[in-house]
Design a protein with these regions (language model features):
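Surface-exposed, charge/polar-rich loops and edge strands
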Residues: 3-185
């Protein structure tokens, strides 16, 4: 199945998990852009090396993660988790940030994009894993996390996905804002 371009279609955002981390699962962004273009995506743009892509196309958005993952696995030998959403959903996640304008340093805010709704999330345990100065907010499509001491020093951050009970991929707030800006262009 190829993605087909159709004027007026929503722009889509793809978030790949676990690529270019610690020298593993190397996927240069030019190669990702080329691969997405070969799949029929139009106006493909990427941001930094962590696997963020914005493109236009006309395809079943639910089928795209598997299509993209399979194409990467065939060409590069590994199949990363891929989340794809309409730019309108991505924008609603950006607009829904409960920490916007409320934290001293927006770099301390992170968003985990959920592959599906976390209906079985262990919210009570999530609260107990947060340090006193940390906080989170869970919605249908995202987990917002404020980590003033840094995400690397947070026990919550390393356990969040397990406690959510669903696959997720995280981005810092600066990256989220840049992807949103790209999707608006």
């Amino acid at each position: 199945m190829l993605v087909r371009y159709a004027p007026g279609m929503d722009t889509m955002v793809a978030l790949l998990r676990g690529i270019n981390v610690g020298g593993k699962h190397r996927l240069p962004m030019q190669d990702l852009r080329d691969l997405l273009a070969e799949l029929g995506c139009e106006d493909v743009k990427t941001y930094i090396q962590s696997g963020n892509a914005v493109f236009r196309g006309d395809a079943d958005i639910a089928a795209l993660p598997k299509l993209i993952c399979s194409a990467i696995e065939e060409r590069f030998g590994f199949g990363p988790q891929v989340l794809v959403m309409a730019a309108s959903r991505f924008e609603s996640i950006v607009a829904g940030n409960p920490f916007a304008g409320k934290v001293a340093d927006p770099r301390s805010v992170h968003v985990s994009f959920l592959a599906e709704e976390a209906i079985a999330a262990d919210v009570e345990r999530m609260h107990s894993e947060c340090k006193d100065n940390e906080s989170f907010h869970l919605t249908k499509h995202a987990l917002y996390f404020h980590a003033p001491d840094g995400i690397g020093r947070s026990a919550f951050a390393s356990k969040a996905e397990k406690l959510l009970g669903v696959a997720a991929t995280g981005r810092n707030w600066r990256t989220v804002c840049k992807i949103a800006e790209m999707a608006r262009d």
